[in-house]
Amino acid sequence: MVQKTSMSRGPYPPSQEIPMEVFDPSPQGKYSKRKGRFKRSDGSTSSDTTSNSFVRQGSAESYTSRPSDSDVSLEEDREALRKEAERQALAQLEKAKTKPVAFAVRTNVGYNPSPGDEVPVEGVAITFEPKDFLHIKEKYNNDWWIGRLVKEGCEVGFIPSPVKLDSLRLLQEQKLRQSRLSSSKSGDNSSSSLGDVVTGTRRPTPPASGNEMTNLAFELEPLDLEEDEAELGEQSGSAKTSVSSVTTPPPHGTRIPFFKKTEHVPPYDVVPSMRPIILVGPSLKGYEVTDMMQKALFDFLKHLFDGRISITRVTADISLAKRSVLNNPSKHIIIERSNTRSSLAEVQSEIERIFELARTLQLVALDADTINHPAQLSKTSLAPIIVYIKITSPKVLQRLIKSRGKSQSKHLNVQIAASEKLAQCPPEMFDIILDENQLEDACEHLAEYLEAYWKATHPPSSTPPNPLLNRTMATAALAASPAPVSNLQVQVLTSLRRNLSFWGGLETSQRGGGAVPQQQEHAM
């Protein structure tokens, strides 16, 4: 009876009538229940869990490889919207080519577009460096403008607005801070190696005497992020490609930044659409030698760019038109109480007049009575083209001043001192330095620069030209003198030759006596 019952329990073979698991003290465990749950009728259990995992893995793959119809349609709608927005942006970009310049800016930062900048049309963003000039045609949206780099051969494109540049800068600073912290954690924990990671290559590693906390606190404060981003981009290759789209100019010289007062510099400064031309040198304005040479150059410019240039005299002290003064009402009282020749209202009026003249996209030359040094205008919004008339030899300048008579000779020391101050300026402070001995060379140098600037500000694609410029040129053509132009050219070149060629022929005039150069100069 017992044997029959055991035989009826299942199809076990004679050698395995009773499984050994029955005598296992842990048949009620969790694993045993799972295993029994997938046991087949033939008793095979080796592939139970494998087959189950295979089925579940296959179902997951089939789920991910088959997106729903709603997801597909949503992706198609997004792509269609993107293409339509890009088409409209291209159409607006094409229309902007013939639009007049709304305003101009000078850049304080550099920009190199990257794929993550969300440019309205990929590949049409404009790359620029610090101190470049941009002509803005119109505002596309809150993040992008339409304009062009003032350089020959550059076409219109998308320019990031100040809001966009600030957001890119903040994102860049955040990534740089994270990169610094991660690099400091991955490095050695010793004080010397920590100093190397925090300070980088620009500052030496501080000694292990307690300065580590100072450098660490300095690292956490974003004092030098804008100045160090170029070097940090080179040190971390992966960070350079992703966050190096906005750059600031490197600092001039070595500075200790611990006590530096942080001041946010705007990415752009609004400047005249055409940079005004200002002559300085060879000495002080108001004295005969300087006024004589500058007047000869103004006459030359008036003839060469007839119909394309406006020459105007400025008597107000435009060096007072600093951005920090005009934007700060508390400083107005200080300026008004000082013994200045011009009031701030008069200065502001002159600045507005210069901006208005530049809107016509004509060349603008300023005969400024009070400007004798480029530093006087460095903090203004004029961004002028500084032309330096340079007399290399102080002896030549002395001879010129003495030849003008006693009224000029008694101010010899003042004029020589002003000339020396100009000579001490680095060449970067001037746009053009006219130090040629021959008249033709000096005039050709000046003409080449201004012609190149004219082409940079008037690209061939900007047709029709500015209507204000058309009216001005038409008026100038109607009012032109019927006298032959060649006579005027001969007069201007002759007057310049009498002055500029005198510098090179000073030794000959000294051997022949001092009356010859004086007679030539009075012929001016």
UniProtKB/Swiss-Prot annotation:
The modification Phosphoserine is found at S44, S47, S73, S186, S193. It is found in: Cell membrane, Sarcolemma; Cell membrane. Signal peptide: none annotated. One of its GO terms (biological process) is calcium ion transmembrane transport. The N-terminus is blocked. PROSITE patterns: SH3 (PS50002). The keyword GTP-binding does not apply. GO terms for molecular function: voltage-gated calcium channel activity. Residues 54-71, 235-247 have a biased composition (Polar residues). Belongs to the calcium channel beta subunit family. Regulatory subunit of L-type calcium channels that consist of a pore-forming alpha subunit and auxiliary beta, gamma and delta subunits. Interacts with CACNA1A, CACNA1B, CACNA1C and CACNA1S. Component of a calcium channel complex consisting of a pore-forming alpha subunit (CACNA1S) and the ancillary subunits CACNB1 or CACNB2, CACNG1 and CACNA2D1. Identified in a complex with CACNA1C. Identified in a complex with the L-type calcium channel subunits CACNA1C, CACNA2D1, CACNB1 and one of the gamma subunits (CACNG4, CACNG6, CACNG7, or CACNG8). This is Voltage-dependent L-type calcium channel subunit beta-1. It comes from Oryctolagus cuniculus.
